[in-house]
Amino acid sequence: MDKVELSDLSFNKDWSFYLLAHREFVPTATDKYACRVSHITLKEPKVVTWERDM
């Protein structure tokens, strides 16, 4: 996906970390959105579908 912005890598006191990725978009009534996360600790990528009421 193009035009994705990433935050700096941020660490918590326990050394866990997070990274925010975002992109501007204009949703329509029929669009469906999902986020896919790949990580070495996951056996397969995790896909989360975003609900309309979020």
Swiss-Prot record:
The gene is B2M. It comes from Mesocricetus auratus (Golden hamster). Keywords: Immunity, Immunoglobulin domain, MHC I, Secreted. It holds the Pfam family C1-set. This is Beta-2-microglobulin. GO terms for biological process: antigen processing and presentation of peptide antigen via MHC class I. Heterodimer of an alpha chain and a beta chain. Beta-2-microglobulin is the beta-chain of major histocompatibility complex class I molecules. It is found in: Secreted. SUPFAM superfamilies: Immunoglobulin. Signal peptide: none annotated. InterPro entries: Ig-like_dom_sf, Ig-like_fold, Ig/MHC_CS, Ig_C1-set. Component of the class I major histocompatibility complex (MHC). Involved in the presentation of peptide antigens to the immune system. GO terms for cellular component: extracellular region; MHC class I protein complex. Belongs to the beta-2-microglobulin family. Residues 3-41 form the Ig-like C1-type domain. It comes from the Eukaryota. Its main location: secreted.
